[in-house]
């Protein structure tokens, strides 16, 4: 339990940031699923368009510290390889 005023404030802020970060992570996962769905459908044009949006969201999330930069790079690399395999 937080005792000092500062630690109580940090606890309040942690609750808010956890909810916000969860929302951002969910958004990134949704964009990644859209790319996977386009790949499964075999539509390279849609997959490429979704990939551009997903990489933008993923990079922004990595810049904010929601994901490690290497994890973002790994996701991008694997999706890119799947899209190239469609051709």
UniProtKB/Swiss-Prot annotation:
Q: Which GO terms describe its cellular component?
A: cytosol; small ribosomal subunit
Keywords carried by this UniProt record = Ribonucleoprotein, Ribosomal protein, RNA-binding, rRNA-binding
Q: Which Pfam families match?
A: Ribosomal_S20p (PF01649)
Cite the residue spans of the region called Disordered. Answer: 1-22
What the entry lists under InterPro entries is as follows: Ribosomal_bS20, Ribosomal_bS20_sf
Does Transit peptide count among this protein's keywords? no
Per the UniProt entry, what are the Gene Ontology biological process annotations, in alphabetical order? translation
Q: Which GO terms describe its molecular function?
A: small ribosomal subunit rRNA binding; structural constituent of ribosome
Keyword Manganese listed: no
Return the Basic residues bias intervals.
Answer: 7-19
According to its UniProt entry, what is the function of this protein? Answer: Binds directly to 16S ribosomal RNA.
Q: Which family does it belong to?
A: Belongs to the bacterial ribosomal protein bS20 family.
Q: What is this protein called?
A: Small ribosomal subunit protein bS20
Species source reads Marinomonas sp. (strain MWYL1)
